[in-house]
Amino acid sequence: MAVAHYFGQSSPLLGFDLIYEPSDKLNHNQASLNRVYDKTIRTIHAIDPQRMIFIAPKLHAAPEDLPNLKLPPQSQNTVLAQWHIFPWGPLKNNGKYPWTSGTAAEKAAIRARINTAIHWQQKTGHVSWVGGWSPGETIRNAPSASQMAFARFMACELKKAKIPYAINADTQFYDGEEGAWRPALEPLLNTMIAPECEKPGEKPGHHTLKPPVPDATRVTPAEASKQKSISP
């Protein structure tokens, strides 16, 4: 609780992520996990009643396990449930990849997991977010067409569901040692943050063209980094 005492009631935009993914004993003992969350939440909120707290279900933060979380009453505005989907991209599972070319079955499987979280939100009144997702475990070169399609679909589905999300991991897009964005991955990052999504009734692949934006008002991550690096 040292961190909670250190910040007290300052830095209101700061939230505490208690356990990114429950593992070991807590991953197999729901009662113990709920007790840990309950005690920690009460202690933190005794210091700052408005502090935002993130908690994750077991089974590696699976959305299917959200109903087993026991959340304190009247905590809808301060406790956010965190769940994960493809935190390291669509890796092979049981000999199969969950995403290849974006088939109807592959898209339906992803929508089903998102809908699981939506139904939990509607039933409990709590809000959830995706604590991390990625189009690939390690991306250093220009993304493939499959990765771009996956990123666009995931981002659009989560935005349509009004579920906020974090991107895993920032080091794939930003080189901390060099202090610069990785230009080859800029299209992928832009797609994950602000995807061009199809609207209802719109034919697949056809998007409304946006008017050109003056160069002075649009600065890409790579350009922003470059400008900072050359300023005195």
Where are these regions (language model features)?
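Arginine residue identity/basic-tract feature
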Residues: 35, 39-42, 51, 111-113, ...
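Active-site region of glycoside hydrolase catalytic domains
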Residues: 1-98, 104, 115-136, 160-166
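Aromatic-rich peripheral "rim/lid" segments of glycoside hydrolase catalytic domains that contact
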Residues: 140-232
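Surface-exposed substrate-engagement region within the catalytic domains
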Residues: 109, 113-125, 136-159
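Residue-level preference for long, well-ordered alpha-helices that form the structural scaffold
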Residues: 29-33, 102-110, 143, 147
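Alpha-helix boundary/interfacial micro-motifs
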Residues: 69, 73-75, 101, 149, ...
